[in-house]
């Protein structure tokens, strides 16, 4: 087993608690389904939110998905002029036998524009 990192992001429509919870649910579900992984494979997850998203902690949404005993951390993404607004990001550290080349990162909705180099 190796320690690997999975990345993902999603853009939500507004600073709304329900939209943040739904966005994280969609992002985490897609990321872990695409990589055939579960909470048992996760070492830790770091979430960031752009400064315009303050209605809920992204980690709270992950807890609701069953990541109860996984160390989770939230932070604010740096406020760069012209950066895409309303984006939630995740960096998940996982244990897996897969190589880096076998991992699939997930950039959803408008956030897909952040990584045009990745396959859909």
Language model features with spans:
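Terminal domain-initiation and capping elements
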Residues: 1-120
């Amino acid at each position: 087993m190796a320690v690997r990192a999975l990345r993902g992001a999603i853009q939500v429509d507004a600073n709304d608690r329900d939209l943040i919870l739904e966005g994280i649910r969609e992002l985490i579900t897609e990321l872990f389904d695409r990589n055939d992984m579960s909470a048992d494979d996760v070492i830790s997850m770091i979430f960031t939110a752009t400064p315009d998203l303050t209605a809920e902690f992204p980690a709270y949404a992950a807890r609701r998905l069953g990541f109860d005993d996984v160390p989770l951390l939230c932070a604010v993404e740096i406020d760069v002029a012209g950066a895409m607004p309303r984006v939630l990001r995740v960096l998940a550290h996982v244990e897996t036998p897969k190589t880096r080349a076998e991992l699939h990162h997930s950039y959803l909705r408008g956030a897909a524009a952040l990584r045009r180099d990745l396959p859909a």
